[in-house]
Amino acid sequence: MAPSGPGSSARRRCRRVLYWIPVVFITLLLGWSYYAYAIQLCIVSMENTGEQVVCLMAYHLLFAMFVWSYWKTIFTLPMNPSKEFHLSYAEKDLLEREPRGEAHQEVLRRAAKDLPIYTRTMSGAIRYCDRCQLIKPDRCHHCSVCDKCILKMDHHCPWVNNCVGFSNYKFFLLFLAYSLLYCLFIAATDLQYFIKFWTNGLPDTQAKFHIMFLFFAAAMFSVSLSSLFGYHCWLVSKNKSTLEAFRSPVFRHGTDKNGFSLGFSKNMRQVFGDEKKYWLLPIFSSLGDGCSFPTCLVNQDPEQASTPAGLNSTAKNLENHQFPAKPLRESQSHLLTDSQSWTESSINPGKCKAGMSNPALTMENET
């Protein structure tokens, strides 16, 4: 356990303040770009009224979407595992008293028995977080900066001072998209005035510095943002997170880098949702609850197709993809309604427990 006291508390407060420096930098840069473009370029330097109106209208639309998506990415709290993944007080007490042997493993085995988890550690053990004292849901990871387990964690982004995960990944993608469009639009409309100032085609004024530096900044950020946005578009198309791209998820049958991929269309809908009218808006519309995800690994993992006794559940082929026969959340089940039927006559849809875990699995702790 981390040391406590006045000194450590002061250090934590200091770190929390320092973590906001990148966000303050982006905010100040955005504020300056507004002044440089809207005032110095459009109002001061542009002489054509029609050009002014068109540029200002398009600019303010992109500016508003940029700020909205950035705000949502920063201030949307990451989702943490629900209470069913936490150990009970009795189980925690047993873990503290028992050595790391068979008795210790049996506690974890019983706790994970009915949870909808299919990923494992590299050694094939249940993924357990000592720090949070919980069994990690699939695609959940512990963030050392936030000191929490984050559902479908992608990465911790210093530019938003927040973890990017299930609750705000769509907002992060839109933030990248609108910031890229914002920079490209500024660079494209500023180019002719940049050339005129560079070749002394316009008189030296206060606007010269702002317009020339604005073009350099917009062009530079366009290059970096285009590569980052392109990379995350590829991740979405494969239904991967940044962490899963660097280290493929491990399932019961072994490692599979495409274990969560359902095909391009369904992968897109996992992040953006079923209603396309919300795709371009920073409004949460992702499918599922962040605790369980459909996979395509039933054929390789017979346990994933198993159900508790008394349940009449089946899993059928959907465009050559197989899904675990477990109850899905209402929004998540939309992925399967086109050509796959689910029989859930005895399943309580309000819970996210299903499936049976292999009692012979070796249990280990993972932080």
Swiss-Prot record:
Residue stretches of biased makeup (Polar residues): 333-348
Residues covered by region (Disordered): 330-367
Sequence intervals crossing the membrane: 17-37, 55-75, 171-191, 209-229
Its EC number(s): 2.3.1.225, 2.3.1.-
Topological domain spans for side Lumenal: 38-54, 192-208
Pfam family, one: DHHC
Domain DHHC intervals: 127-177
Class in the EC hierarchy, top level: transferase
Residue segments, region Mediates localization to plasma membrane and recycling endosomes: 299-367
Catalytic activity field: L-cysteinyl-[protein] + hexadecanoyl-CoA = S-hexadecanoyl-L-cysteinyl-[protein] + CoA; L-cysteinyl-[protein] + tetradecanoyl-CoA = S-tetradecanoyl-L-cysteinyl-[protein] + CoA; L-cysteinyl-[protein] + octadecanoyl-CoA = S-octadecanoyl-L-cysteinyl-[protein] + CoA
Family: Belongs to the DHHC palmitoyltransferase family.
Subunit structure: Monomer. Homodimer. The monomeric form has a higher catalytic activity.
Protein name in the entry: Palmitoyltransferase ZDHHC2
Source organism per UniProt: Homo sapiens (Human)
Taxonomic placement: Eukaryota, Metazoa, Chordata, Craniata, Vertebrata
